[in-house]
Amino acid sequence: MIRTKHLISIMLVLTLLFSSSALAAKPKATHTPPPAEITKEIVEPPEEIQHLLEIVYNEWQTVNGKDQGKKNKYTAWYNDYPWGKNKWCAGFVTWCMLEAGIPQAYEKDVMALEEGVAPEKFYHVTSSKPTTMVPGYLHMHRTSEIPQKGFIVQYGQKNNRYTHVGFVYDVVPNADGTYRLSCIEGAVLNTVRM
């Protein structure tokens, strides 16, 4: 009896293994392109990003430390409601990207793209807050621990919560392999700061 059950079990397994559905042609795997190579050398940004940095710098100079309030030109692209005090850093980043003409899409549209793929050389995740901006960049595989001028810097907490974003304006490598960054950020003490 035990031998018969063993034989039936083996036959059942073999039948399943060699059934037509098991032998059906499987779809071919698609080629995954290698991630963009990120250099460890500090390089000058491309013309489009240099233009973006000029806009960012001009905003810093124009604002000159003045309080921008809870509703300002950096938030108007999203809505006309007052934002929380010091809560418009991602709005500032997106406003600058819009001014520079950088192509972009909202996070839900970016997340609908194939992972690791962005439709343009330069592409921004339109967002009014860091918590939706950063996941879109992660989805496009556009993150790095090697800073470059024009990159978006994101700050977070140990609980993996993204709390603030800004622009890397300048990078100076230190002898110990770390970097000194100069950043321009919106919503720092309710103004634009470097």
Task: Identify the meaning behind each predicted range.
Residues 18-34:
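Sec-dependent signal peptide cleavage junction
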Residues 1-8:
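Bacterial N-terminal signal peptides that target proteins for export
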